[in-house]
Amino acid sequence: MTWAGLLIALVGALGYALGAALQQYEAVAEGASLKLVRRPRWWIGGAIGFAGACLHAVALSLAPLVVVQPISVATLVFAVPLAAFMYGRKPYRAEILGSLAVAVGLLWLMLLVPEHNVTPHLGNGAALGLLAVIGVIVLVTQVAAGRMSGAGRAIVLAIGAGVVTASVSTFVRVVGGGLEGDWGRLVHWFTLAVPVLLVCAVVLLQRSYAVGYFGIAYAGVQVIDPITSVLAGALLLGEPLPTAPGTAVPALLAAALTIGGTITLGRLAPDHTRPVVPANPAAPIEATAGSGSTVTAASDAS
């Protein structure tokens, strides 16, 4: 069942990448506001992304969290070119190299985590503790983003979106993996938490996309989501982490590759769908000369 889960996760992740590219294009055009609900392309992107998320949920019910999560990382190399295509341009070399570095580094890092396929169990106290920690992280990132701009703002908002997305994956893993043929187990507040957290994740994602730095925003979510999921799986669900001494050097190299790719993406210029208006545009003024003749001059910003 693990291989079936991996294949389903791959298809779902590709759909999620396409949906993200479509929604980011609209979020840059309209901003992270209610205006987005009037944009058909934003809804199409949302539907495709939702289908991808549903497939991801199915995959989580068939395979461990630490096995499924790394699959979504590889879609970064597809999402960035798709976003570039939306703006009618070819992807920059730095975008491709940065995306590959992040994807390879994070996938390498995740593959160091040993496989452990057992029925997940999460107590109410631990679940509430997880939500409290996620809430604090989101609050801190939102406050910090309000004082930042550019790539820094995009990555900080992506961190908040990533941890919420990871919480969705954790609850889906617990609900789906714990069914064991008993559908009555769906009657639990964990099941209700999934759509609520999913809506929060979507809102936070749109805020991150709206900054215009799709590469760094998407990469940020792709990095934070699986790392947070693996930590949650290890701390709350009893899933193992790599402890062998031989994994230390590979883990450091993988982390360096991931960080280097993220920095590369952060240095790229943002994409815009609206022309940039100069800060002090020259506005014509009218001056009367002689008997009613009009002379037009450019205003002096100084």
Name these PLM-found stretches:
Residues 1-302:
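Polytopic alpha-helical membrane proteins, predominantly small-molecule transporters/carriers
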